[in-house]
């Protein structure tokens, strides 16, 4: 039997092969400009560095790293978006610096006999730090590929929680099953709770 986690991850690979989700992430100006500012305003950190982009998506962080002076960038993604990332890299004239690798970070080897990288970059946190389920993959990449004293960006996060009243959401999402156009469908609610 296939585990629910395995099914969830397979679904994520399908979703992340589509351009829509990447458009949403890149159009998040705070998120993308924060990465761009960090990478592009730290040329001494990135100059001549070997960089690993875990879960590269469209390759936007890899492009920033190459523009900041990275010697080599390995952009890894398990979904089919890697094929589009490769086209984007070529369209920007950076194929001599950026190598796109289509595969799971846990299963790939870096080419050119490279075993360690100087910097790992990744947009692993998704929404609310947990959505993309990438943290374990990034930690695997860190333990396997990051040289001692290397940089992981981002390297820390903080999650803050606040209480709220969800009764309206419950009413909209769960309560409405009690009367669906005059029909009783509340047996469906049991599977949602």
For the regions a language model picked out, list residue spans one by one.
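Class I SAM-binding transferase module
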Residues: 1-54, 58-193
